[in-house]
């Protein structure tokens, strides 16, 4: 999947870069609604995994000072995706859902499942490597 900075369309998968290794994902509905598996803005400082849930914010809150990128799907990906209206419906049905786990149930899993009907995260291996290097003191 390719990612570009452009105007979002209802049901698009959207991401922002958090740091060099990780991105944050959500489902774009409009500039006033992005549904994401994230931390409530009022709880960001000192928040734990237990505080993370599916919530709705606007695009400015979601982008947190960075530029949002929207998924530009190949023909094959477009054929596999759930239609945009149903994508938004699925995302909204999960508002308030918890159970966040950075490896097994993260924001990318959430967005991908809403768009394609199955969980997937390209970041799993990055997160595993980051956790391993932090635990062993490696800085690679």
Q: For each of these PLM feature ranges, what is it?
A:
Residues 82-140:
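Activation targets extended, charge/polar-rich intrinsically disordered C-terminal tails
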Residues 1-3:
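Short alpha-helix capping/helix-loop boundary micro-motifs
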Residues 5-75:
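Glycine-rich catalytic cores of cysteine/serine-nucleophile enzymes that process amide/ester linkages
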Residues 8, 12, 79-82, 105:
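Short coil/turn linker and secondary-structure boundary residues
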Residues 61-95:
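Aromatic/basic micro-patches that form nucleic-acid/chromatin recognition or nuclease catalytic surfaces
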């Amino acid at each position: 999947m390719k990612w570009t900075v452009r105007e979002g369309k209802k049901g698009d998968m959207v991401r922002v870069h958090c740091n060099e290794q990780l991105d944050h994902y959500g489902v774009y509905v409009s500039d006033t609604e992005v549904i994401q598996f994230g931390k409530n803005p009022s709880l960001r400082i000192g928040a734990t995994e237990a505080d993370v849930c599916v919530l709705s914010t606007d695009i400015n809150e979601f982008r947190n000072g960075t530029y949002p990128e929207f998924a530009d799907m190949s023909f094959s990906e477009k054929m596999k995706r759930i239609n945009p209206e149903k994508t938004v419906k699925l995302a909204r049905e999960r508002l308030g859902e918890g159970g966040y786990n950075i490896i097994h149930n993260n924001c990318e899993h959430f967005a991908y499942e809403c768009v394609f009907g199955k969980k997937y995260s390209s970041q799993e291996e990055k997160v595993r490597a980051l956790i391993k290097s932090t635990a062993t003191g490696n800085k690679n």
